[in-house]
Amino acid sequence: MRSLLAKILTAFVAIAALGVVAPTPAQAADTAYFEMTDITRERFIVKLTNPAKIQHARDLLNGDTTDRPHVIGRILKRQADYNPQWSYHLNGDTVDFFDVAIEVCDATIPYIEDHLDEAGGAFLPGLVWCGWSTRLVREVTA
């Protein structure tokens, strides 16, 4: 009887502890924001909405992986509230990571800003941007 009571009490304490230890807001959210840079050292915020991609970004920042360190995604030609310095942002649903990509989608953060009216034609066809020198710097709050 004493053994059964000890097991029940242990299980109760374990369940109660799970309720007390909650994930941090950055870890619990379905959306995460990351600051990235490129060869120009300008800063740009990327919104991620896919849990696997959020984890990959965190793994890159923690040094747990070096695979696919560069950012690729489809540009939206409008400002985002989390990225007010720029007249464009990446569609969070299209953001991914890569090792190597074709040259036609490569550009720097400020070059896109300066040539945004040309994006989607011969410059960044399909509005796909794959900055070869992009890298994440840190996770940020929105």
Can you say where each PLM-predicted feature lies in the sequence?
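Secretory targeting and sorting signals
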Residues: 1-28
